[in-house]
């Protein structure tokens, strides 16, 4: 029973598409993310004005969707398959998170080419957690997760290899 608090789980998968311009491109990105995840994506606004790119602060320039629970695990398997079952070792940070990019969204199993969408790339960020990690997010009496209870990069890599059969390159 002592090992139950040390069990690592996949907390969430975040898919992000930054298109760099507002208008129809953002709607197309939302449609593509909705098709991939089965959830409704939200728009991401520009944090600051970039005159060179014609982007104003507050203007929607991307789309993102967060998937949690059982759906996150199923989606993660599809995303790893799109990457050929390999993730770079440098994709992992020191806190149990890792990210990678997918160059063409049609590489994901179950996604067919749609001429209305075209071919888009996306960023994938996955967050791992352990029981007890909720103390850093609760509204009252927030606390830090102790150093010995944090997920290290090595533990995260072992989890991904064991749970998803992914090769770390």
Swiss-Prot record:
GO terms for molecular function: rRNA binding; structural constituent of ribosome; tRNA binding. Keywords: Ribonucleoprotein, Ribosomal protein, RNA-binding, rRNA-binding, tRNA-binding. InterPro entries: Ribosomal_uL5 (IPR002132), Ribosomal_uL5_arc (IPR022804), Ribosomal_uL5_C (IPR031309), Ribosomal_uL5_dom_sf (IPR022803), Ribosomal_uL5_N (IPR031310). Transmembrane segments: none annotated. GO terms for cellular component: ribonucleoprotein complex; ribosome. Gene3D superfamilies: 3.30.1440.10. GO terms for biological process: translation. Part of the 50S ribosomal subunit; contacts the 5S rRNA and probably tRNA. Forms a bridge to the 30S subunit in the 70S ribosome. Belongs to the universal ribosomal protein uL5 family. HAMAP family: Ribosomal_uL5_A (MF_01333_A). This is one of the proteins that bind and probably mediate the attachment of the 5S RNA into the large ribosomal subunit, where it forms part of the central protuberance. In the 70S ribosome it contacts protein S13 of the 30S subunit (bridge B1b), connecting the 2 subunits; this bridge is implicated in subunit movement. May contact the P site tRNA; the 5S rRNA and some of its associated proteins might help stabilize positioning of ribosome-bound tRNAs. This is Large ribosomal subunit protein uL5. It comes from Cenarchaeum symbiosum (strain A). The gene is rpl5.
